[in-house]
């Protein structure tokens, strides 16, 4: 049972957590496993689903007036007694019956199970296409009826707006208010959106608005201080959120894991005018160093300045101001400039729009116009691209996803690809992962992986595969890793006479139209990660007869879960569909990790393209490179969390806020 008294706390949230010892972490893992087995095992979930269906049957014959009275009685009971199982089952019955009448959709038993798992505070792993948007209405509406503010957190604004628009009629019929909050809204619009019972928003918008509340309130963000402000009629209107009560995180592995590598920072223009000149000098110095002699590059590691490079820099800085005479400071600045030059590429990590450098989210493939890199990296990339340089920023507040989501009174989530990171999610967020079987067996056909030595060979094979499907009338979705790769492949398709659409961060305003047409007969769509998580491509009966949607992956990402999300765009809810990988040993992953081994295997595969051992060893190397990249990101997340804990401990000692 979940019953928290929120009265007297104007901004309810969990207190900050201290880092646990390894023994405490092991104990917590054991406790989570036992609670998961006890609360959400198959027998419990099966009985719950049957009781919900029975409760719905009892209410189907009620008049509208009697049904409203029953819902009012249930609402009062939920607010008085909390989320007791008997009350939850009745609430689920109301939600299912209302969805059936208002939306024309009734929750399947597997969706009832997924909703219950989330309401109990777990992460439900449901296959792509199983209807997670509708499933989320069960815990969201039930918690809202019980008096809690619910945040339904998604990975992008397109999904937040779409899901809210689809489900608002259901919530309205239940007497629950809904709101959508996007980054482009002003403070008044956001405040109004956050006042709703169920709020749809993105993870970044939610975190940044929380940080803005902290900046606004400072040390007054404490129950006693805020209660006093509310008593005297002040303070409450200053904040946007109503606290951190209950969050349902969609695509939870993306938000909890993939996006958790960098902290969320609110900054303001720096008052130090000399900092911009300092960065220009750093860039100028970096251009006078020679790769291989003065600095080295290795995979995803930052550029490393050699002893010769250190001596060269010391010589170049002899006549520069005193700030350049310290070895550590100058080498750190020049290394950052080299990072901007070599590690960040246009149309991969950022785009140029309206003479501005705009960050592209690696995970979602979307432009983040209001985001910027820290520690001068944004300005150095702007210098590199020759666009207007924005003033450097100073940090006002920062927090990591790991620390932020642990502050919710209750946290839950759902995803189709979280089993690989279940241990990390349990350790960091205290969330157990519960697998939910699909409603219908998958009809997806997994075609053999095609591996080529060179990217040009792989692209030619992609063109041939797409042409075959196009002639059969089968729609094709081709996934690429970057904007540049999507545009290069588009050029190959145009030369081959294949009509197609391209969806990447440069065409983000046409997203709805492109997605709507991606399932048309004979349609060809090239897309980055924007067509990954949450994208539902509708198919006609005619297209299903042609074999359904065919998905081609042209390059693997840094973790296998992103690839699986793309595969999940086809064969949804029992529809037919197929999936294929056409890769090369020239792909980005193979360029970063043990490149000498990659070149050797590439030369061997080029000489003997049909030799089984050459292809097999090539795929072993490719999988290893992907695994190595994933482990590297995991190390970064652990280090960020460790730093976050250390910062919090030091600030709590000094009395400052993080």
From Swiss-Prot:
It catalyses: ATP + H2O + cellular proteinSide 1 = ADP + phosphate + cellular proteinSide 2. CDD domains: DEXDc_SecA, SF2_C_secA. The keyword Manganese does not apply. ATP binds at residues 111, 129-133, 536. Its main location: membrane. InterPro entries: Helicase_ATP-bd, Helicase_C-like, P-loop_NTPase, SecA, SecA_CS, SecA_DEAD, SecA_motor_DEAD, SecA_preprotein_X-link_dom. Keywords: ATP-binding, Cell inner membrane, Cell membrane, Cytoplasm, Membrane, Nucleotide-binding, Protein transport, Translocase, Translocation, Transport. One of its GO terms (molecular function) is protein-exporting ATPase activity. It is an enzyme of class 7 (translocase). It holds the Pfam family SecA_DEAD. It is a peripheral membrane protein. One of its GO terms (cellular component) is cell envelope Sec protein transport complex. GO terms for biological process: intracellular protein transmembrane transport; protein import; protein targeting; protein transport by the Sec complex. It comes from the Bacteria. Its EC number is 7.4.2.8. Coiled coil: none annotated. It is found in: Cell inner membrane; Cytoplasm. PANTHER family: CHLOROPLAST PROTEIN-TRANSPORTING ATPASE, SECA INNER MEMBRANE COMPONENT OF SEC PROTEIN SECRETION SYSTEM. Monomer and homodimer. Part of the essential Sec protein translocation apparatus which comprises SecA, SecYEG and auxiliary proteins SecDF-YajC and YidC. Part of the Sec protein translocase complex. Interacts with the SecYEG preprotein conducting channel. Has a central role in coupling the hydrolysis of ATP to the transfer of proteins into and across the cell membrane, serving both as a receptor for the preprotein-SecB complex and as an ATP-driven molecular motor driving the stepwise translocation of polypeptide chains across the membrane. Belongs to the SecA family. This is Protein translocase subunit SecA 3.
């Amino acid at each position: 049972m979940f019953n928290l008294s929120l009265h007297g706390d104007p901004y309810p949230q969990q207190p900050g957590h201290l880092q646990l010892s390894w023994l405490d972490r092991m104990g917590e893992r054991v406790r989570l496993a036992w609670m998961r087995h006890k609360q959400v095992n198959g027998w419990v979930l099966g009985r719950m689903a049957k009781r919900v269906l029975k409760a719905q049957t009892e209410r189907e014959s009620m008049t509208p007036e009697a049904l409203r009275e029953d819902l009012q009685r249930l609402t009062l009971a939920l607010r008085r007694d909390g989320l007791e199982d008997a009350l939850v089952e009745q609430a689920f019955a109301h939600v299912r019956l209302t969805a059936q009448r208002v939306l024309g959709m009734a929750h399947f038993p597997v969706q009832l199970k997924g909703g219950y798992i989330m309401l109990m505070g777990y992460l439900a792993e449901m296959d792509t296409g199983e209807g997670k948007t509708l499933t989320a209405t069960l815990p969201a509406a039930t918690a809202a009826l019980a008096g809690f503010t619910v945040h339904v957190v998604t990975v992008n604004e397109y999904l937040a707006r779409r899901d809210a628009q689809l489900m608002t009629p259901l919530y309205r019929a239940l007497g629950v208010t809904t709101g959508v909050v996007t980054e482009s809204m002003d403070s008044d619009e956001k405040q109004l959106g956050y006042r709703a019972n169920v709020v749809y928003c993105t993870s970044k918008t939610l975190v940044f608005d929380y940080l803005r509340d902290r900046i606004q309130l400072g040390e007054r963000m404490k129950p006693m201080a805020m209660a006093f402000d509310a008593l005297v009629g002040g303070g409450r209107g200053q904040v946007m959120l109503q606290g951190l009560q209950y969050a349902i995180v969609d695509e939870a592995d993306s938000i909890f894991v993939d996006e958790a590598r960098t902290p969320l920072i609110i900054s303001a223009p720096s008052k130090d005018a000399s900092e911009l000149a300092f960065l220009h000098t750093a860039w100028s110095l970096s251009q006078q160093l020679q790769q291989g002699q003065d600095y080295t590059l290795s995979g995803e590691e930052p550029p490393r300045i050699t002893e010769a490079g250190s001596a060269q820099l010391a010589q170049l800085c002899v006549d520069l101001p005193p700030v350049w005479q310290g070895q550590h400071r100058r080498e750190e600045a020049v290394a950052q400039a080299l990072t901007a030059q070599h590690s960040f590429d246009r149309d991969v990590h950022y785009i140029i729009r309206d003479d501005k450098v705009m960050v592209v989210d690696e995970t979602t493939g979307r432009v983040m116009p209001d985001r910027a890199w820290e520690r001068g990296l944004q300005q150095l990339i702007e210098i590199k691209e020759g666009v207007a340089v924005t003033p450097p920023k100073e940090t006002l507040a920062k927090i990591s996803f790991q620390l932020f989501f642990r502050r919710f009174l209750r946290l839950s989530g759902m995803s189709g690809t979280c089993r690989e990171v279940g241990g990390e999610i349990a350790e960091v967020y205290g969330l157990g992962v519960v697998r939910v079987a699909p409603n219908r067996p998958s009809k997806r056909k997994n075609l053999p992986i095609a591996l080529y030595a060179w990217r040009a060979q792989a692209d030619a094979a992609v063109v041939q595969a797409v042409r075959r499907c196009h002639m059969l009338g089968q729609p094709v979705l081709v996934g690429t890793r970057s904007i540049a790769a999507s545009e290069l492949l588009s050029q190959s398709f145009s030369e081959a006479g294949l009509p197609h659409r391209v969806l990447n961060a440069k065409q983000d305003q046409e997203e709805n139209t492109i997605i709507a047409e991606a399932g048309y007969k004979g349609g060809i769509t090239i897309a980055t990660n924007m067509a990954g998580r949450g994208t539902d491509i509708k198919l006609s009966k005619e297209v299903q007869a042609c074999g359904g949607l065919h998905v081609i992956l042209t390059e693997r990402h840094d973790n296998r879960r992103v690839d699986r999300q793309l595969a999940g765009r086809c064969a949804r809810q029992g529809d037919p569909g197929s999936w294929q990988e056409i890769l090369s040993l020239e792909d980005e992953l193979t360029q970063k990790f043990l490149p000498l081994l990659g070149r050797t295997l590439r030369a061997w595969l080029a000489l003997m393209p049909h030799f089984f051992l050459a292809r097999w060893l090539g795929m072993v190397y490719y999988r290893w490179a992907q695994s190595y990249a994933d482990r590297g990101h995991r190390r970064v997340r652990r280090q960020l969390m460790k730093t976050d804990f250390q910062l919090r401990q030091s600030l709590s000692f000094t009395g400052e806020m993080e």
